[in-house]
Amino acid sequence: MINLILLGLPGAGKGTASESIVDKYHLAHISTGDMFREAMANETPVGLEAKSYIDKGDLVPDEVTAKLVEERLKQPDTKNGFILDGFPRTTVQAELLEGITKRLEKPLTNVIAIDVDEDVLIKRLSARYICKNCGATYNKISNPTKVEGTCDRCGGHEFFQREDDKPEVVKNRLEVNKKMNTPLRDFYEEKGILSTVNGEQTPEKVFEDIDKILSKD
C-alpha cells in the first residue's frame, strides 16, 4: 500500500505528477479543496462546522480540517492507498495527520519533495497569459499559442497577464510558501520517509523518478 504526500512550491508540477501516480497506482486522490466543497454540499457535521468559518471569511482551524481529512480517509476508496493534496501545510497539521494515520492504521509510506530552483519557478509561473476576448489561458514556456499573437480558440489578438502572475507577486508567493514548506520537509526528513526528485526535468522524467521511489517499497 502507498500512502503518499507530495511536497513542492507552486509551479513545481505536483498536480501533473499526482495525476500520473493516481493513474498507475489507483490511489485515492484526496484534495482538501474538494473535501471542503463535498462536505459542505452534503451538509455533514464537519462540513457545516467548516462552512461556519468560511462564511465569515475566517480560516478553518487545523482541528476542523483534520476531522475532515480523517472522515475522508475512512472512505473505502482509500483501501489501496492515497495521495494527499493540500494537507498538511504546517508541522502542526503534520502532527495532527500522524495521529489520524495511527488511529486508522494507515501510516504514511512516502513523502516526496519535487525540487525546482526558485528562478525557474518564477519563469514558469509568470509565463501565463490570457486572451482578453475569450479567457483562454496560455503559457509562454509550456503551452504557447500555435500562431504567435493569435488565440487558438477565438482568433483574438489581445492578451493580458493577471496581477498575481507578475514576477514580483510570484516571488512573494514563493517566499510565503517556502516558509511553510521548509519545516515540513525537516519534519518528514526526521521521520526517515522523505525523498526528493528534480522537478526541472520533463513531466515524464519526473514521474519516472517518482515511480522508481514508489516501486522500491
UniProtKB/Swiss-Prot annotation:
It is found in: Cytoplasm. Residues 127-165 are annotated as: LID. It comes from Lactobacillus gasseri (strain ATCC 33323 / DSM 20243 / BCRC 14619 / CIP 102991 / JCM 1131 / KCTC 3163 / NCIMB 11718 / NCTC 13722 / AM63). The lineage of its organism: Bacteria, Bacillati, Bacillota, Bacilli, Lactobacillales. Transmembrane segments: none annotated. GO terms for cellular component: cytoplasm. One of its GO terms (biological process) is AMP salvage. Residues 31-60 are annotated as: NMP. Consists of three domains, a large central CORE domain and two small peripheral domains, NMPbind and LID, which undergo movements during catalysis. The LID domain closes over the site of phosphoryl transfer upon ATP binding. Assembling and dissambling the active center during each catalytic cycle provides an effective means to prevent ATP hydrolysis. Some bacteria have evolved a zinc-coordinating structure that stabilizes the LID domain. This is Adenylate kinase. HAMAP family: Adenylate_kinase_Adk.
